[in-house]
């Protein structure tokens, strides 16, 4: 419940622009947010392994 309320709070426009922060829309995690994909690192990994992220593959060298 607390995480859901923080997700709603983060989506609102803040009084000052410096107070804005990103939060994962899937799990609500505030840290390790990947701007390019719009999710946190954990959700990014799960989505890329299941093939939900187009053009993303596990690296191998």
UniProtKB/Swiss-Prot annotation:
**Which cofactors?**
Zn(2+)
Do the record's keywords include Ribonucleoprotein? yes
Q: Which GO terms describe its molecular function?
A: rRNA binding; structural constituent of ribosome; zinc ion binding
Question: From what superkingdom does this record's organism come?
Answer: Bacteria
Which positions does UniProt annotate for Zn(2+) binding? 24, 27, 40, 43
UniProt KW keywords: Metal-binding, Ribonucleoprotein, Ribosomal protein, RNA-binding, rRNA-binding, Zinc
Hey, which family's this protein in?
A: Belongs to the universal ribosomal protein uS14 family. Zinc-binding uS14 subfamily.
Q: How does it assemble?
A: Part of the 30S ribosomal subunit. Contacts proteins S3 and S10.
Describe its function.
Answer: Binds 16S rRNA, required for the assembly of 30S particles and may also be responsible for determining the conformation of the 16S rRNA at the A site.
Q: What name does the UniProt record give this protein?
A: Small ribosomal subunit protein uS14
The scientific name of the source species is Solidesulfovibrio magneticus (strain ATCC 700980 / DSM 13731 / RS-1)
Q: Which gene encodes it?
A: rpsZ
